[in-house]
Design a protein with these regions (language model features):
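Active-site gating loop/helix substructures
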Residues: 1-2
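Active-site core segments that coordinate phosphate-bearing ligands/cofactors
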Residues: 8, 14-183
Length: 183
């Protein structure tokens, strides 16, 4: 008696259930990439959930620190990098502001709409500004997969950028930058 299924190299039909074809499984990253981006080479997909993920389709196997080569369709690979604090960093920022507002006013309500407005204001105030004058937020609050001991940081604080808008925009930029550096 066989306890584990046979390993296969492609999606195969296994049978049907309620008149639907049942196939071999693929990983969640592979399934989301296929559904969102298809199977074109050099296509890049960014997912932002609790963590963040950047995936690119390649016909060549490749590994680097922090990058996994995951099998995909027809002998291709998804090169995937993942951050531990993707959307979690934004949720942490919202919680920070919500706790401040509750302390100041006694009211507690979600502030994501306010953060969205502040992000736009932050982008407008940062556009064209030199990097050394922009608030830099590293959103590695829970470390990284390669360096779990790493922590987040805020640098380049000045009287010009010590604003809620700069913090919101800087957090979003930090979330994006962490994934971009993997690419």
């Amino acid at each position: 008696e066989q306890w584990l299924p046979q390993v296969c190299t492609r999606i195969e039909a296994l049978g049907s259930y309620r008149e639907r074809i049942v196939t071999t499984a693929i990983g969640d990253n592979q399934a989301s990439f296929l559904g969102a981006a298809g199977n074109e080479n050099n296509t890049l997909l960014v997912n932002m959930g609790t963590g963040g993920q950047i995936s690119v389709l390649s016909d060549q196997y490749f590994t680097a620190e922090g990058i996994e080569a995951r099998p995909f369709l027809h002998g291709t690979y998804l090169l995937a990098g993942a951050s531990l604090c993707g959307g979690k960093a934004y949720a942490l920022l919202e919680k920070f502001f919500r706790e401040f507002v509750k302390e100041a006013t006694g009211q507690e309500k979600p502030l994501y709409k306010t953060l969205e407005k502040l992000a736009g204001d932050g982008k407008a105030s940062c556009t064209g500004r030199e990097n050394r004058k922009k608030l830099q937020i590293e959103t590695t609050f829970d470390g990284t997969r390669v360096h779990p001991e790493q922590t987040g940081s805020i640098t380049n604080l000045s009287t010009d950028n010590f604003t809620p808008a700069a913090f919101v925009y800087g957090t979003l930029e930090g979330m994006s930058r962490e994934l971009y550096q993997m690419y």
